Amino acid sequence: MVLRLSFLVLWMLVFAGLAAQTLGGSSAFNFLRLQLHPQAGALGGRNVSHFKADLGMVSENPSLLRESHHAVVSANFTSLAPSITGLYAAGAYHLEKKATTVALGITHLGYGEQSETDASGNTLGTFKAYDQSLGVTVSRIYNKKWYYGSTLKLINSRYGAFASQGLALDVGLNYYDEKRMIQFGFAAKNMGVQIKSYGNGKEDLPFDLVLGMTKQLEKAPIRFSLTGQRMHQFDLLYNDTLFNETNFGRQPRANLGTKIFSHFVLGADILVGEKIVLTGGYNVLRRRELRIQNFASGLTGFSYGFNLNLQRLRCYYARTHYQSALSHHQISFSFTLEAAGD
């Protein structure tokens, strides 16, 4: 009965999110789209099904929070640009009597000190800008193979004199078959409201519907992941009609194949012994959106990294290429406060 009720609430929330779709970039709190954990970053930037997920991956899918994350703390750092940094920290605890795992996560994006000017370009001074969110995640297991969870996020954003607050909810579901070493994942992200707007009118949140699968080969130390992002929207082409009136920089209309494959994110892990994992990923949409016409695209859309697994410490690193001359680095440390048997 509880599971059926959970599914009913889940789909009601999903369809509520489907009713609030906006042009990419025109919604509020778009920093919620960013992935600030290097494990997901190295896998292409989206993954909701990885069954060896670190605690930081809970920001991708709340149902990835497991009992194994008990007493784990994680700190993540992302360098997006010379003056833009992203920080994400999380901690988890398993409530044995309630068979429930809970986690607290904090996100902070700082955009540095910016110049404040008037309409004529005269410098008036400087201001600071940042985005923040505080999330509480709850996850449980059902019938040994099903995991379900949700994250409630409080959002705070300030750009100088302009401030905004919001409330968002993520819900997730996983099916894990340990014998076949395969996991399927589902997440509906950023469903909520803007409580206080920057100006007079309120904006929608950047809703996303993500599906994924991760499979480990039986006779080779390799895991593959296939993830579909923004599955509620068929055509992901950024088509700003107001901007296109100038016909400057307008890309050709996407064909059917491009529309389909733009949803996909591919990822792979190579297990080097028991302590080292090499990771690579490819984000089709990122390569399409950020390529520069008539110029070589290079590694745009590709990402890679590694993680080092020690007894109580895990270290993750990722590098993501946005354009030939632009990439960002991510690093994360996860520490288990209690050893097994403590």
What are these regions (language model features)?
Residues 4, 8, 22-24:
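Short linear sequence motifs
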Residues 6-17:
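Bacterial N-terminal signal peptides
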Residues 1-5, 144:
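Positively charged n-region of N-terminal signal peptides that target proteins for export
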Residues 21-342:
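Subset of outer-membrane beta-barrel
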